[in-house]
Amino acid sequence: MSLLELTAVELAKEIKAGKTTAVEAMKAVLEQIEKTEETYHCYITIDKEKAMQAAKEAQEKIEAGTLTGPLAGVPVAIKDNLCTKGVVTTCASKILENFVPQYDAEAVVKLQEAGAVMIGKTNMDEFAMGSTTETSAYGVTKNPRNPEHVPG
Protein backbone atom coordinates (compact mmCIF):
# COMPACT_ATOMS: atom_id res chain seq x y z
CA MET A 1 0.00 0.00 0.00
CA SER A 2 1.24 3.48 -0.90
CA LEU A 3 2.09 5.93 1.88
CA LEU A 4 -0.54 8.22 0.37
CA GLU A 5 -3.26 5.62 0.96
CA LEU A 6 -2.60 5.28 4.68
CA THR A 7 -4.67 7.07 7.30
CA ALA A 8 -2.82 9.46 9.60
CA VAL A 9 -2.92 6.89 12.40
CA GLU A 10 -1.63 4.12 10.11
CA LEU A 11 1.16 6.35 8.81
CA ALA A 12 2.18 7.33 12.34
CA LYS A 13 2.43 3.64 13.26
CA GLU A 14 4.58 2.94 10.19
CA ILE A 15 6.89 5.83 11.08
CA LYS A 16 7.15 4.80 14.74
CA ALA A 17 7.89 1.20 13.67
CA GLY A 18 10.69 2.38 11.38
CA LYS A 19 8.97 1.03 8.26
CA THR A 20 9.10 4.51 6.74
CA THR A 21 10.21 7.97 7.86
CA ALA A 22 8.69 11.40 8.26
CA VAL A 23 11.00 12.53 5.44
CA GLU A 24 9.78 9.79 3.07
CA ALA A 25 6.16 10.59 3.92
CA MET A 26 6.63 14.33 3.32
CA LYS A 27 8.48 13.67 0.07
CA ALA A 28 5.63 11.43 -1.16
CA VAL A 29 3.05 14.09 -0.32
CA LEU A 30 5.01 16.91 -1.95
CA GLU A 31 5.56 14.82 -5.10
CA GLN A 32 1.82 14.15 -5.30
CA ILE A 33 1.06 17.84 -4.86
CA GLU A 34 3.58 18.67 -7.61
CA LYS A 35 1.74 16.29 -9.97
CA THR A 36 -1.80 17.37 -9.17
CA GLU A 37 -1.87 20.94 -7.82
CA GLU A 38 -2.37 22.54 -11.23
CA THR A 39 -5.55 20.51 -11.64
CA TYR A 40 -6.99 20.65 -8.12
CA HIS A 41 -5.77 24.00 -6.66
CA CYS A 42 -5.82 22.60 -3.11
CA TYR A 43 -3.09 24.80 -1.65
CA ILE A 44 -2.55 28.52 -1.25
CA THR A 45 0.86 28.28 0.43
CA ILE A 46 3.49 25.55 0.32
CA ASP A 47 7.11 25.98 1.36
CA LYS A 48 8.69 22.73 0.18
CA GLU A 49 12.08 23.41 1.74
CA LYS A 50 10.57 24.32 5.10
CA ALA A 51 8.28 21.27 5.00
CA MET A 52 11.17 18.93 4.21
CA GLN A 53 13.33 20.51 6.92
CA ALA A 54 10.51 20.15 9.45
CA ALA A 55 10.08 16.49 8.45
CA LYS A 56 13.82 15.90 8.86
CA GLU A 57 13.80 17.51 12.31
CA ALA A 58 10.74 15.47 13.30
CA GLN A 59 12.42 12.26 12.16
CA GLU A 60 15.53 13.05 14.19
CA LYS A 61 13.34 13.59 17.28
CA ILE A 62 11.43 10.37 16.62
CA GLU A 63 14.68 8.43 16.39
CA ALA A 64 15.94 10.10 19.58
CA GLY A 65 12.70 9.19 21.35
CA THR A 66 11.75 12.80 22.08
CA LEU A 67 8.83 13.04 19.60
CA THR A 68 6.27 10.42 20.54
CA GLY A 69 2.88 12.03 19.91
CA PRO A 70 0.09 10.17 18.12
CA LEU A 71 0.83 12.00 14.84
CA ALA A 72 4.63 11.97 15.12
CA GLY A 73 6.06 12.69 11.67
CA VAL A 74 2.72 12.74 9.85
CA PRO A 75 2.39 15.46 7.17
CA VAL A 76 -0.73 17.60 7.63
CA ALA A 77 -2.30 20.45 5.70
CA ILE A 78 -3.58 23.47 7.62
CA LYS A 79 -6.67 25.34 6.46
CA ASP A 80 -5.70 28.88 5.50
CA ASN A 81 -7.94 30.50 8.11
CA LEU A 82 -5.87 29.05 10.97
CA CYS A 83 -2.98 31.25 12.04
CA THR A 84 0.47 29.73 11.62
CA LYS A 85 3.35 31.65 13.16
CA GLY A 86 5.66 33.04 10.49
CA VAL A 87 3.61 31.62 7.58
CA VAL A 88 1.31 33.74 5.41
CA THR A 89 -2.34 33.23 6.40
CA THR A 90 -4.71 34.74 3.85
CA CYS A 91 -8.15 33.28 4.64
CA ALA A 92 -8.25 32.94 0.81
CA SER A 93 -8.59 36.72 0.49
CA LYS A 94 -6.38 39.24 -1.27
CA ILE A 95 -7.09 41.57 1.67
CA LEU A 96 -4.81 39.39 3.83
CA GLU A 97 -2.32 38.32 1.14
CA ASN A 98 0.60 39.66 3.20
CA PHE A 99 -0.61 38.77 6.70
CA VAL A 100 2.00 36.78 8.63
CA PRO A 101 0.75 35.85 12.12
CA GLN A 102 3.02 36.15 15.14
CA TYR A 103 1.36 33.15 16.81
CA ASP A 104 -0.12 29.73 16.06
CA ALA A 105 -3.84 29.04 16.39
CA GLU A 106 -4.65 26.63 19.22
CA ALA A 107 -5.63 23.91 16.72
CA VAL A 108 -2.20 24.25 15.09
CA VAL A 109 -0.50 24.07 18.50
CA LYS A 110 -2.40 20.84 19.27
CA LEU A 111 -1.33 19.31 15.92
CA GLN A 112 2.27 20.29 16.63
CA GLU A 113 2.07 18.79 20.12
CA ALA A 114 0.78 15.57 18.54
CA GLY A 115 3.89 15.55 16.31
CA ALA A 116 2.29 16.51 13.00
CA VAL A 117 4.44 18.25 10.36
CA MET A 118 2.87 21.05 8.29
CA ILE A 119 2.80 20.66 4.51
CA GLY A 120 1.23 24.02 3.74
CA LYS A 121 -1.98 26.04 3.86
CA THR A 122 -5.07 24.82 2.01
CA ASN A 123 -7.39 26.76 -0.24
CA MET A 124 -10.90 27.56 0.95
CA ASP A 125 -13.76 29.97 0.37
CA GLU A 126 -12.80 33.53 1.23
CA PHE A 127 -13.05 33.91 5.02
CA ALA A 128 -14.53 30.37 5.14
CA MET A 129 -17.87 31.66 3.89
CA GLY A 130 -19.00 28.70 1.80
CA SER A 131 -18.11 25.14 0.88
CA THR A 132 -17.25 25.18 -2.83
CA THR A 133 -14.19 27.52 -2.87
CA GLU A 134 -15.93 29.56 -5.57
CA THR A 135 -15.20 32.70 -3.56
CA SER A 136 -11.49 31.99 -3.04
CA ALA A 137 -9.21 34.70 -4.39
CA TYR A 138 -6.82 31.87 -5.30
CA GLY A 139 -9.07 29.83 -7.59
CA VAL A 140 -11.65 27.09 -7.28
CA THR A 141 -10.54 23.84 -5.68
CA LYS A 142 -11.64 20.56 -7.22
CA ASN A 143 -12.37 17.43 -5.24
CA PRO A 144 -9.38 15.10 -5.76
CA ARG A 145 -11.59 12.01 -5.40
CA ASN A 146 -14.07 13.27 -8.01
CA PRO A 147 -13.34 16.56 -9.82
CA GLU A 148 -17.04 16.88 -10.70
CA HIS A 149 -17.87 17.29 -6.99
CA VAL A 150 -17.12 20.23 -4.72
CA PRO A 151 -14.36 19.69 -2.16
CA GLY A 152 -16.39 20.75 0.88
Region locations from a protein language model:
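Secretory-pathway/luminal and periplasmic proteins that interact with or process carbohydrate-rich
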Residues: 34-39, 60, 83-88
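Long amphipathic alpha-helix in the N-terminal Rossmann-like dinucleotide-binding domain
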Residues: 51-56, 115-116
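Immediate post-signal peptide segment of exported/extracytoplasmic ligand-binding proteins
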Residues: 58-74
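Short glycine/serine-rich loop/turn segments
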Residues: 72-152
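Alpha-helical scaffold segments in soluble metabolic enzymes
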Residues: 10, 28, 57, 106, ...
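An N-terminal boundary/leader segment
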Residues: 1-53
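Short, polar/charged, Gly/Pro-enriched helix-capping and turn/loop motifs at alpha-helix termini
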Residues: 40-43, 65, 69, 125
